[in-house]
Amino acid sequence: MIMKQEKKFSFADARNVLSQFNQIEKNRNQYQKKSNKYKKNIVKASKNYLKNETMRVLEGIPVEELNRGKKGIRVKLLRTHGYNSYADVDYVSVKTISKIKGISPQKARLIKDIVANAKSATQEGIYLKLNVDHKTPETTDIILNTMRLKNVNDLMYSIDEIYQVDSQKRKEALRNLKTAKGFFRWLFSSGNAKQKAIESYDYLEMVLSSGFKEKIENIEKDSLSLEQSISNDYAWNEFTKNPICFNTLLEEIIPELIGGQNDVYGLPETIVEEIQTEDYSLDGLHCNLRRYQKFGVNYILHQRKVLLGDEMGLGKTIQAIATMVALRNQGETHFIVVCPASVLINWCREIEKFCDIQPIKVHGSTRQSGFQDWLDRGGIAVTTYETTSLFELPESLKCGLVVVDEAHYIKNPDAKRTNNTKRLCTHADRLLFMTGTALENNIDEMIRLIHILNPDIANKIKGMKMMPFAPLFRETIAPVYYRRKREDVLSELPELLENEEWCEMGYKEQWKYYECLSKEGHNYHEIRQVSWNVDDLHDSSKASRMLEIIEEAKEEGRKVIIFSFYLDTIRKISKLLGDQCTEIINGSVSPKHRQEIIDGFESASAGRVLVSQIMAGGTGLNIQSASVVIICEPQIKPSIESQAISRAYRMGQSRNVLVYRLLCSNTIDERITDILARKTNVFNAFADQSAAADNIEIDSASLTQIIEEERSRMKRAS
C-alpha cells in the first residue's frame, strides 16, 4: 500500500515555485528574440554594404560604356546633363532621362535596362570583405551585431546544457504542480492529482535548492556584463582573434555574401544529394567548422575511401579530425594518422587542441611503448611513413579511419613505405588520403593513389590521361577525389593565415642543441639557432619542413619570403636552395641593391624564394608578389615578426598570406613562444593589439633564465 504524502506547502508556495521556473523560461524566450534581432540587424547592415559596394563599382563605369554595343545612345548628352557614370544613371528614372532633349523614351528605357543589368551582375559578384584595416560603418555594424549574436548564442547554449538535464521530468512536474495553484483548483482535483502535485513540489524544490536557478542566473549575469562591454573596437578585436567563428555565423545568415550558398563545390549533383543526407554527431570537437568543411566531412564519411586534395590553408587537418570525432561518436575506437616526420608534432598538437580524442605518438625512442599503448587504449596513433613497418596489427583489429597525410609520399609503388602504408590500409574500411598538391598535373601519380582507394575508378581514368580537366574525367573521379580552391569556398578569403609548424628534432640536431647548452656563458644566439646550426641542413627538421612548404607554394603558383634573425642561417638556406633563391638581403646590402633584388623577385615565376635577415628585409620594403612567409625562429619581440609579415601582407596583396613559424618542440623555441603568448594575453587585457606588439619583448635577463632552465631540463633528461 502506497503511503500518501501530506501537503506541507501553501498555494502561494506552489505559485512561487511555478513563477521561478516560468521566469527562467521567459528569459530563454527573450534571448531567442535577441538572437533574432541581431540576425535582422546583420541582414540590414549587409544590404547597406551590398548597396554601397554596388554603387562604388557603378561609379567607376563611365557612361561611354552604354554605347559599347553601338546602340546609338547619345552619351555626350548624358555627360552634358551631369550623368558621368552608371551610378548617376541608376539614381534617376526613365522619365527623368527621357526629358533630355535628343533622348527618346525608348532610348531612356534602353539606358536604364543596360544599367540595371550591369547592377544585377555586379551584385552577384560582390562578397563581404571584412578587413580590420578598412572598416566601414556597414562592416562595423555587421561585426558588432555578430559579436552580440555570438554572445547570446553562447548564453543560450550554456543555459540549455543545464536546462536539458531531466527536462521532461521537470516539465511533467510543472504541469502536475498547477493543481496546487489555488484553493478551488485543489478542491476539485482528484486524490491522484493532489498526490502528484505534492511529489512534484518536493522535486522542484529539490531542483531549486541544488543550485539550478543560481547556475543559470550566474551565466546570465556574466553574459549581460559582456554584452554591456561590447564596443566596436572590442568586436573587431574579437574578430581578428577568431575570424572563422564570425564567418561561420555569417555564412548561416547571409550565405549569398559569404559564398556559402553553394553546397555543391564542383561535385555532380547525384553525389551531392547522397552526401547531404549523412547524419553524425561532432560532440567532442572543439572548433567551429565552416560550411565547406562540414561538407568535406560529409563527403569523407559517405564515400568511405577518398583522396582530399583541398588547397593549403583550407583546413584538411581539421576535416580529418572532425571525421575521426564523428566516427568515435559512432563507436569506433582506433584511428591512425600516417604523416611525414616534419609534421608529426603538428598533428599531435592539432588533435589535442581541436578534439577530445587522445593522440598517441608512435615514433622515436618511445615508438614501441606508444604502439602498445594505442593497441590497449585506442585513440589516434600518429606515426611516420618510416615507422609504419612497426605496425603489426592483429587480424581482428579494425581501425575506424586511416589518414594518410601528404599522400604523394607513397606514389612509388615499389617503395617500402608505400607497401607498409597499403598494408595498414587493409585494416580499415575507411581511408582518407590528403594532399595539397594539384594531382591533375600528374595523372600517373593520381592513378596510383586512387588505385589504393578504388581500383575500378583508377582503371577507368587510365584511358583519360590526356584529358585531366575535362568534365567527364572530373565526373569519373568525383566519388573518390575532391579538391577545392580557396576562391571556390572562401569568398571573403581570410587575408592572413598563421601556422605554428612544430618540428621534431633528429639525433644530430638534439646533439648540437645539447652541445650549445653545455657551453659556458650565456650564448643564447647560438642556442636560438636550433636545428639550423647542424653542419648539414639535410639533417635539419626545420629545413625539411621549409622545403615541403616551398614545394607546396610552387604548386599553387606562390612565391616565398624566408626571414631569419641570423646571417649564418640565411646563408645556409641560400646555399641549400641554390638557383631557386634570389640573392640574400642582409644589413650590408644597400637600399638601391635591395630594391633591385626585390624587382627581380617580383618578376620571377612561382616557387621563387627571397631570403632575408629579418632586421634588414623586415621593414621598409613592399613585396606583395609573395604570399607565403616563413619565419625560421621565434623573435624575442612580436613587432619584429609583425613588421616582417607586413612586407607581404599589405595593400595591393591579391592573395591570402600564409605565415609559417618553424619551431622545435622541447627547446628554447617552445619556451620563447609560451612566454610571449602569456605576455601578449596579459597585455591585450589592458591595451590594444598594436600597442602590445610594440611593447612586448623578452629581455636579456629573461633569456638568461630560459637558458638556465633549459640546461636544468637537459640534465634531468640525461
Protein language model features and the residues they cover:
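Interdomain linker/hinge connecting the two RecA-like lobes of the SF2 helicase core
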Residues: D414, I447-I450, D456-N459, K465-R558, ...
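SF2 helicase motor core recognition
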Residues: S389-L393, N441-I443, I570-S574, Q595, ...
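Charged, low-complexity
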Residues: N29-M55, Y127, D141-L149, N153-K171, ...
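Conserved helicase ATPase core of P-loop NTP-dependent helicases/translocases
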Residues: R367-Q372, K559-F563, R571-K572, D579-G617
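Conserved SF1/SF2 helicase motif Ia
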Residues: L307-L314, Q319-E350, H427-R430
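A conserved SF2-helicase RecA2
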Residues: I636-I645, Y649-S718
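Conserved P-loop NTPase motor "coupling/switch" region that bridges the ATPase
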Residues: N329-H334, R349, K353-P359, D376-R377, ...
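Small-residue hinge/turn detector
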Residues: K71, K101-P105
